[in-house]
Amino acid sequence: MASDNLVVLNALDTARTQWYHVTAVIIAGMGFFTDAYDLFCISTVSKLLGRLYYYDPSTKAPGKLPHMANNWVIGVALVGTLSGQLVFGWLGDKLGRKKVYGLTLILMVICALCSGLSLGYSPKSVIGTLCFFRFWLGFGIGGDYPLSATIMSEYANKSTRGAFIAAVFAMQGVGIIFAGLVSMTISKVFLMNFEGKPFNVDEVLSTEPEADYVWRIVLMLGALPALLTYYWRMKMPETGRYTAIIEGNAKQAAIDMGKVLDIEIQAEGDKLAQFKAANEYSLLSNEFFQRHGLHLIGTMSTWFLLDIAFYSQNLTQKDIFPVMGLTSKANTISALREMFETSRAMFVIALFGTFPGYWFTVFFIEKIGRFKIQLVGFFMMSVFMAIIGVKYDYLRNKEHKWTFAALYGLTFFFANFGPNSTTFVLPAELFPTRVRSTCHALSAALGKAGAMISAFGIQQYTQDQDVRKIKTAMLLLAFTNMVGFCCTFLVTETKGRSLEEISGEDGRQNETQMKTTRPVSGHPDDGWE
């Protein structure tokens, strides 16, 4: 009820949607644009790196990254992301969201630029330098996950909060599209001026020397969106919930949020003690486990399982495209042509499969709810991956390539109109202000642990384009999604409720506590909602 809440928090919950909410989505969302661009553009350039630095004339085949080098080039940013999520998530609760929010962008800008540099021209020096800077790039990207989600959830009104958080995350879809588009455009420009011969015509001249500039330009352009939003991110005030509930300064919260919402909010201190008392327990306390333990297990497990499947799809699609017939065989084209075709296929799949799913979530999350979207998404992903795995021999024939592409695209669609979006939204809503950023970070970090399994494990099944291994990988991912479907029952629906009502910060019991105190009879008058 509104009367149980602080005036400033009630003002945030009931405020009409206005321009400031939109700018907050853009400012926070550009971090995810950068995140997706930087993490996924490596898929478009990794084959080029192999042809440039690992060509062996004795093999009579185009150069490709050794398994270990390939895993580290792709996976090291995920290791950095996991580390950054934990560090910045904790700092966001201890120091405040705003104080550490700009540092993530600084890391992204510097390390994206440095990713295009290398110390020397030997394979070890180039790959070693690239991995070093991509780790710290991932570290900055990781910090953006808990901070952006928490800031958006604490700024938004309760009727559109899920849509706003999902819109921030949907910028990841835009970033994935641009990763393909930019790679495609730059490689095409170089092709128009420096195209080499097909590999089966001339093994040496098929790898254009100018291609060494292409991958560097693609990676360095990832700094641009982060750089453009740094000033506006620094102009954002601390969230009213953190200022009021954690810092105990209801007056400053009222001033800051009054400016943001362009309304006058009365400062209120008499209810502040109630909220601070409800927030005193720590993350490792028995009280936290009783109140929120199942929810934390639910958000961590579902994000972990989702990212095994989602990152496996994104990071290995470059290996599956030739099997689908969407790109030419490597030994029939030049290095730049291979990058162009891989980028084009990635762009098409993202545009028609990945991108729409994000925005379906934005438009329907407040109507259908987080819980149902996540359940259906996990289930449909499992169905389509199982079909691909079982019918793989049939689908890999060239005459069925568009059926294959449609099924593959639908798995992306239901990942994003499903658990890839909702696993980001739910941890930003389920937990109390004092530990909200940390709990989101823990959930996201488990997700990146799943992504690391895909980068260092699942890729072993697809990199050699072995039919039996790819079938095994798809069936394994289908099973993983069904486990995620089951783990979804550990979380609860959050739509239409204030953050304080969901977490029990307003002095009332949250849903986990209600389950332990509801009477067996279950009559409405006996305490059921």
From Swiss-Prot:
Cytoplasmic side: 1-21, 93-99, 147-161, 233-291, 366-374, 427-437, 493-529
UniProt-recorded Gene Ontology molecular function terms: symporter activity
Record Gene3D superfamilies: MFS general substrate transporter like domains
Biased segments, Polar residues type: 510-519
Region Disordered, residue ranges: 501-529
Sequence ranges on the Extracellular membrane side: 43-71, 121-125, 183-211, 313-344, 396-405, 459-471
Top-level division of the source organism's lineage: Eukaryota
Pfam families assigned to the protein according to its UniProt record, in alphabetical order: Sugar_tr (PF00083)
GO CC terms of this entry: periarbuscular membrane; plasma membrane
Glycosylation (residues): 314
Other noteworthy facts: Although related to the sugar transporter family, it does not transport sugars.
Family to which the UniProt record says this protein belongs: Belongs to the major facilitator superfamily. Phosphate:H(+) symporter (TC 2.A.1.9) family.
UniProt function note: Low-affinity transporter for external inorganic phosphate (Pi) probably involved in the acquisition of phosphate released by arbuscular mycorrhizal (AM) fungi (e.g. Rhizophagus irregularis and Glomus intraradices) during AM symbiosis. Acts as a Pi-sensing machinery at the root tip level, independently of AM fungi, involved in the regulation of early root branching and lateral roots formation.
Full protein name: Low affinity inorganic phosphate transporter 4
Organism of provenance: Petunia hybrida (Petunia)
